[in-house]
Amino acid sequence: MAKKTNKFLRVNTEGGYFGLGRGIDFQNVLNRLAIIIVLLSSVAATMWKSFAGATSEASAYFGLNTAAAVLFAWLIAQELDPDRKLGGVIAAIVAIVFAFLLGVGNVMPLLWLLFILRLLNRTSGAIHKIGDNILLLLLAFWLGKEGQWLYPVFTGIAYILESRLPRGYFRSLYMGGFAFALVALAEVSREPVTISINNIYLMAVVFVLLLPAISMALYTQFKGDYDNVRISPRRLQAAQGSFIVITFAVAWFHGDAEALNMSPAWAGAIGVGMSLLAAALQNAFYKKKI
């Protein structure tokens, strides 16, 4: 009798140690424009801080952090609405405005969020591999030790949700168990948590603008980078819904500091919503003209 093979073995080992990484298509005009905006934002932020009287080190640090925030806003917008590139460009511009008005926070939560979204929507066209899992668990552990205990909690929930979505990977359950174990190592801050009314207003705007994208996800035609297969609309909607729950929850339970960290992600959602709104207005104008 032939030896029974593991049907998950091929997809688990094929393609190296990372499956959630995605390349950038520099042939796309909007992608090139977004990269230019990222680079210019660093220069503009550095000069603005210098003219404000900051030291050269503080100015350079602010410039690099601003560029990182703009970059993640663009990347996260691509995960929330992979079919339309314009949303990412708008998100980058909104992120610059946020950086100048609100300041910049820690980019580690943004890196974690980016990989959580890719874990769920599978825009890369591949399942998570050992490298992705190590990165996500390390980020969850580090953020948990910083007092942000919700990150390992949401990491575990995301892995379990991934296993239940179409073409879910059964080993996600194991990773979810590891993530929940990290909750025991997380620090819980004893300081009172406050969140400003401005951040609550901002969350309301994000929620309203992202709702059309969740509806449009049913009609996605985006194909995974590696397998060139249309991604599951349910997976895309799961990522979008998780984005709302995660970003709102960490801001609510961890306060204004975490809301600042989430502001580039919210810029990504606003860019997606504004892109869809612009497309709807253009379509309505075209129909009226006909």
PLM regions and their residue ranges:
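Generic multipass alpha-helical transmembrane bundles of integral membrane proteins
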Residues: 119, 125-249
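N-terminal topogenic module of multi-pass integral membrane proteins
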Residues: 1-131, 142, 238-290
